[in-house]
Amino acid sequence: MYPEELCMPMREDLTSVGFVEMRDPEDVAEILDKKEGTVLVMVNSVCGCAAANARPAAKISTNHSKRPDVFATVFAGQDIGATAKAREYMHPYPPSSPSIALFKDGNLVHFIERHHIEGRPAEMIAENLIQAFNSYC
């Protein structure tokens, strides 16, 4: 685990635009067990592709007119229990951080894995999310 003071700005990068932090398994269950509505979950990370690509893309997507009911985040490598619980909902995809998942009515409907984030500009990833929002939100 990294020191919390190192991770705080990475957390705030998302919470400052309305993402709800899920810090423990109970937080995850409270949000993802709901069977109505849409939820975007960003699996945050300290890696460079989270900073350069995933978080900026997630932030850009919050400005779209058609959007999920809830934007939420877990922090891989920091909030171990919450991340493990969130990943239970992301099957059949293997653990991936960063990653971005969209749920509708309790079902996983769209997933962006790390290998779809690395090397792609934030705008391209955001467009992928926006297309998913247009389809599911």
Q: What is the meaning of each model-derived region?
A:
Residues 22, 43, 66-84:
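Thiol-based oxidoreductase modules, predominantly thioredoxin-like and allied folds used
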Residues 30-65:
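Local sequence-structure signature of Cys/Sec-based thiol-disulfide redox active-site neighborhoods
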Residues 83-97:
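Short acidic (Asp/Glu) patches
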Residues 1-36, 133-137:
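N-terminal leader/targeting and pre-domain segments
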Residues 94-137:
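Non-catalytic, surface beta->alpha helical segment in thiol-disulfide oxidoreductase systems
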Residues 45, 50-58, 70, 82, ...:
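Amphipathic alpha-helical interface surfaces
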